[in-house]
Amino acid sequence: MRDLKGIFSALLVSFNEDGTINEKGLRQIIRHNIDKMKVDGLYVGGSTGENFMLSTEEKKEIFRIAKDEAKDQIALIAQVGSVNLKEAVELGKYATELGYDCLSAVTPFYYKFSFPEIKHYYDTIIAETGNNMIVYSIPFLTGVNMGIEQFGELYKNPKVLGVKFTAGDFYLLERLKKAYPNHLIWAGFDEMMLPAASLGVDGAIGSTFNVNGVRARQIFELTKAGKLAEALEIQHVTNDLIEGILANGLYLTIKELLKLEGVDAGYCREPMTSKATEEQLAKAKDLKAKFLS
């Protein structure tokens, strides 16, 4: 099995103004991540890819383009989770056939699913696809808060490799790593890379890595090497950048920063605001000049 540790960009998707997928732009984003950001892999089909506003066929098209462009240069994780289990299975089978290294699935959301229902969801995707699985835990968006015992139940399935941990509960993170040292944890909050790395995470998956991947790796590797003061200085700069991005509109701003690098990052998918305002464009230029030049 391919090594899935390290720095993974949560892949942005370029859309045309009419909302269709901009294949040329998407390929440029992928190449930028591989050639410039030097990431270890891509997490395809997640929140950053505006996934939950897309049709099944559009999701498949993005999986296809990403695999065709990246080939075997880096590791690829396909996020196939959906509140529709049949869609999750269909996407999982498709990504597996394409040769994705691993699947991931967000916990089923909106309805208040019981834990046995959540476990059934993961076990079904795994059984139907035969691929490995990374649980995607993002409780502030899904409302699903799992404890250490529940993760332990999921980990009884040998195909569950670990969790993408997008939560602020670092006590739970530490407890999980101690209780299940052979299961991997990917940090999901870019702004908390240093504390996550100090607690032993195996990698990180982040949206801002599309433009700030080099610093993300520096923070991760310096922290692992015990050089905390150096790592903290880079985390400070990173968080200044992230603060500016968040204040200006997360996905729009990252796309505008990519455009300033010559990447056709396109528009966002409605009902998100699809196009940056002049004020947002000016702020993106300011962020690039301060942090990415």
UniProtKB/Swiss-Prot annotation:
Q: Where does aceneuramate bind?
A: S47, T48, T166, G188, D190, E191, S207
Q: What is the E.C. number?
A: 4.1.3.3
SMART domains, per the entry:
DHDPS
Catalyzed reaction equations: aceneuramate = aldehydo-N-acetyl-D-mannosamine + pyruvate
Q: What is its main location?
A: cytoplasm
Q: Which Gene3D superfamilies does the record associate with it?
A: Aldolase class I
A GO CC term attached to the entry? cytosol
Q: Does the keyword Transmembrane apply?
A: no
Catalytic center residues: Y136 (proton donor), K164 (schiff-base intermediate with substrate)
GO MF annotations in UniProt: N-acetylneuraminate lyase activity
- Indicate where this protein resides in the cell: Cytoplasm
Which family does the UniProt entry place this protein in? Belongs to the DapA family. NanA subfamily.
| Subunit note | Homotetramer.
Function, as annotated, reads:
Catalyzes the reversible aldol cleavage of N-acetylneuraminic acid (sialic acid; Neu5Ac) to form pyruvate and N-acetylmannosamine (ManNAc) via a Schiff base intermediate.
The name this protein goes by in its record: N-acetylneuraminate lyase
Species name: Haemophilus influenzae (strain ATCC 51907 / DSM 11121 / KW20 / Rd)
What would be the name of the gene that encodes this protein? nanA
